[in-house]
């Protein structure tokens, strides 16, 4: 039998157009249509953690004597391709375009509304 090696996970950082603190809307999956704030981005895995979306329940065993176990609910990550930036003013989700200003700075702009993010 040949010896097989497990697949190597790419460690290359992926540029993400979604940043911490952005308001996003989920476009696919069981939480489709939900909106929330991005709590954390995971650029190596190309995933984001969104507040109130993809809730998972975890059972924690007691760590010390006399302490009781507990059930913890927390947000799990969602792939970045499954969320879109959300405009709170127009109440619509949109794709993002990178715009270079005259002074050379890069800004993010919502394609549907033309609203500047940064």
Swiss-Prot record:
Keywords carried by this UniProt record: Ribonucleoprotein, Ribosomal protein, RNA-binding, rRNA-binding
Stored Pfam families: KOW, ribosomal_L24
CDD domains, per database record: KOW_RPL26 (cd06089)
GO annotations of cellular component type: ribonucleoprotein complex; ribosome
Transmembrane segment boundaries: none
GO biological process terms on file: translation
GO molecular function: rRNA binding; structural constituent of ribosome
Family matches, as SMART domains: KOW
Record text on subunit structure and interactions: Part of the 50S ribosomal subunit.
Similarity annotation: Belongs to the universal ribosomal protein uL24 family.
Role according to the record: One of two assembly initiator proteins, it binds directly to the 5'-end of the 23S rRNA, where it nucleates assembly of the 50S subunit.
Protein name per UniProt: Large ribosomal subunit protein uL24
Organism in which the protein naturally occurs: Prochlorococcus marinus (strain MIT 9303)
Phylogenetic placement of the source organism: Bacteria, Bacillati, Cyanobacteriota, Cyanophyceae, Synechococcales
């Amino acid at each position: 039998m040949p010896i097989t090696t497990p697949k190597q996970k790419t460690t290359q950082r992926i540029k993400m157009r979604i940043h911490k603190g952005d308001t996003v809307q989920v476009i696919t999956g069981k939480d489709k249509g939900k909106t929330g704030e991005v709590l954390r981005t995971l650029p190596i895995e190309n995933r984001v953690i969104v507040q109130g979306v993809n809730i998972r329940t975890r059972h924690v065993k007691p760590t010390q004597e006399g302490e009781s176990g507990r059930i913890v609910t927390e947000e799990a990550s969602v792939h970045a391709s499954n969320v879109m930036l959300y405009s709170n003013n127009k109440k619509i989700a949109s794709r993002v375009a990178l715009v270079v200003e005259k002074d050379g700075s890069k800004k993010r702009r919502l394609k549907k509304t033309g609203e500047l993010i940064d």
